[in-house]
A protein has these predicted regions:
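Short alpha-helical "recognition helix" segments of helix-turn-helix
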Residues: 27-28
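N-terminal acidic leader/helix
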Residues: 1-23
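Short, charge-rich amphipathic interface segments used for partner binding and complex assembly
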Residues: 32-57
Length: 57
C-alpha cells in the first residue's frame, strides 16, 4: 500500500524510483497502482515526473 498523504507519497515514490525502479511505469506495474493516480496527487503539490532524472521534481 502506498502513502495517501502527498508529501509522504513524494518521498516514498522518489526513494523507490531511485533505489529499485528504472521508470515510473515499472514501479506502477510492480506495485499495481495507476500511474495517473500518482502523477495527479503529486501534481497537486507541484511535483511532476521527470523521465530523464527518474524522479518527481
Amino acid at each position: 500500500m502506498i502513502p495517501q498523504d502527498p508529501v509522504m507519497l513524494l518521498s516514498f515514490i522518489n526513494l523507490k524510483l531511485r533505489d529499485f525502479y528504472g521508470s515510473l511505469k515499472q514501479l506502477c506495474d510492480d506495485l499495481d497502482v495507476k500511474e495517473q493516480e500518482i502523477t495527479d496527487k503529486l501534481a497537486a503539490i507541484d511535483y511532476n515526473y521527470d523521465e530523464e532524472r527518474n524522479q518527481f521534481v
